[in-house]
């Protein structure tokens, strides 16, 4: 089912500003919150849709991506192409906790500031999805990625104010970022509506970042993928996330790795498994075959006479490197015996002759099995 338009979900226009988005979200969140609608699946689903829409549209970077690409901007890892993708979902700090402080502050008569006035605010963490091959996981690699992120504005140095000017202490909250109001017997504290909790106002905003203190830019980064890395591994690049606000530290970038399934090898920890089909005659008479391993070398496997289906051969040290270790796993070759198809008349005659010449010693397992079965049912 197609996802609803985020603007329609919040009931705002595509030109809605931060204040309009926040107001719409607060009203809808109070209406559909699970605590007010227990055991109501539709309200719970609507509540999740509202959260997702607001989380996207309140962030200038995500909103720009959504306006350009729609929901596709956040699918399969989000923006980006090739072997990886970018998405900030799930990591951005802050979220809508400050909104709920206001909502439940009004309902319960309390609330606590999430950040101090004009305080340093840490940048959001970012996520980048990267797919690599099993060969790359075996050898390791250095990957170049491009990540769209928010960086500190170089014109205003992150203040958000036009060069030569400074942000001013908010006159409404006196720099605290919070305001109090009496409602009956309760004293309600909420985020300052003038400075939106920052404790400062900017009368003359920077022309480049428009008062945000940050601008969006695509950065190129080198990521070291160590040998032996496993599927699902998370790599943290400290300080490579979004820039902080008002001098706060940058967030982190998390690389989530997935290893593409291989055509021939399956992995279990440091060990590799490979199924090799051989002919019925090779299994019966014995023989040899070569296997090319992940390091590019060839290993010869000797098949003894009378090899049965499922027989495993172990090639020691031919598996995956153990991460940050000198150890290496093993490669296990499992035999699959291929039954002949589309026999010629002569081949059929020879097999029939072979069948007539066969004895119990040639097929001990099947002979013994049917004998045991007959004895079981005959009593």
From Swiss-Prot:
Binds 2 Zn(2+) ions per monomer. It is found in: Cytoplasm. GO terms for cellular component: cytoplasm. Zn(2+) 2 binds at residues 170, 173, 192, 195. Coiled coil: none annotated. One of its GO terms (molecular function) is zinc ion binding. Gene3D superfamilies: DnaJ domain (1.10.287.110), Heat shock protein DnaJ, cysteine-rich domain (2.10.230.10), Urease metallochaperone UreE, N-terminal domain (2.60.260.20). Its cofactor is Zn(2+). Residues 5-70 form the J domain. The keyword Acyltransferase does not apply. The keyword Amino-acid biosynthesis does not apply. It comes from the Bacteria. Zn(2+) 1 binds at residues 153, 156, 206, 209. Keywords: Chaperone, Cytoplasm, DNA replication, Metal-binding, Repeat, Stress response, Zinc, Zinc-finger. Changing residue 59 to A: Loss of function. A zinc finger (CR-type) spans 140-218. InterPro entries: DnaJ, DnaJ_C, DnaJ_domain, DnaJ_domain_CS, HSP40/DnaJ_pept-bd, HSP_DnaJ_Cys-rich_dom, HSP_DnaJ_Cys-rich_dom_sf, J_dom_sf. Pfam families: DnaJ, DnaJ_C, DnaJ_CXXCXGXG. One of its GO terms (biological process) is chaperone cofactor-dependent protein refolding. Participates actively in the response to hyperosmotic and heat shock by preventing the aggregation of stress-denatured proteins and by disaggregating proteins, also in an autonomous, DnaK-independent fashion. Unfolded proteins bind initially to DnaJ; upon interaction with the DnaJ-bound protein, DnaK hydrolyzes its bound ATP, resulting in the formation of a stable complex. GrpE releases ADP from DnaK; ATP binding to DnaK triggers the release of the substrate protein, thus completing the reaction cycle. The J domain is necessary and sufficient to stimulate DnaK ATPase activity. Zinc center 1 plays an important role in the autonomous, DnaK-independent chaperone activity of DnaJ. Zinc center 2 is essential for interaction with DnaK and for DnaJ activity. Homodimer. Belongs to the DnaJ family. This is Chaperone protein DnaJ.
């Amino acid at each position: 089912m197609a996802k609803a338009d985020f603007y329609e979900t919040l009931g705002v226009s595509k030109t809605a500003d931060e204040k309009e988005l926040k107001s719409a979200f607060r009203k809808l969140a109070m209406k559909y919150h699970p605590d007010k609608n227990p055991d109501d699946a539709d309200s719970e689903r609507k509540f999740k849709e509202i959260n997702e829409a607001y989380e996207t549209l309140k962030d200038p970077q995500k909103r720009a991506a959504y306006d350009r690409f729609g929901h596709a901007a956040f699918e399969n890892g989000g923006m980006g192409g090739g072997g990886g993708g970018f998405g900030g979902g799930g990591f951005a700090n802050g979220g809508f906790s400050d909104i709920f402080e206001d909502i439940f502050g009004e309902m319960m008569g309390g609330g606590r500031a999430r950040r101090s006035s004009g305080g340093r605010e840490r940048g959001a963490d970012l996520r980048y999805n990267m797919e690599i091959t099993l060969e790359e996981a075996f050898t390791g690699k250095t990957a170049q990625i491009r990540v769209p992120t928010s960086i500190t504005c170089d014109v205003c140095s992150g203040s958000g104010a036009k060069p030569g000017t400074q942000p001013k202490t908010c006159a409404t909250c006196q720099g605290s970022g919070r305001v109090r109001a009496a409602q009956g017997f309760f004293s309600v504290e909420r985020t300052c509506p003038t400075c939106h909790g920052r404790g400062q106002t900017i009368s003359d905003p920077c022309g480049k970042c428009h008062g945000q203190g940050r601008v969006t830019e695509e950065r190129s980064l080198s990521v070291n993928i160590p040998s032996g890395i496993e599927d699902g591994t998370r790599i943290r690049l400290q300080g490579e996330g979004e820039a902080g606000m008002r001098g706060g530290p940058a967030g982190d970038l998390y690389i989530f790795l997935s290893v593409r399934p291989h055509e021939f090898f399956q992995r279990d920890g440091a060990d590799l498994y490979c199924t090799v089909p051989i002919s019925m005659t090779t299994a019966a008479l014995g023989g040899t075959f070569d296997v090319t391993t992940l390091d590019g070398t060839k290993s010869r496997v000797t098949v003894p006479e009378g090899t049965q289906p499922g027989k495993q051969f172990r090639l020691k040290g031919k598996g995956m490197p153990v991460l940050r270790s000198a150890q290496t796993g093993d490669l296990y070759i499992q035999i699959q015996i291929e039954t002949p198809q589309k026999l010629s008349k002569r081949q059929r005659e020879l097999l029939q002759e072979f069948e007539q010449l066969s004895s119990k010693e040639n097929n001990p397992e099947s002979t013994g099995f049917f004998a045991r079965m007959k004895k079981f049912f005959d009593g």
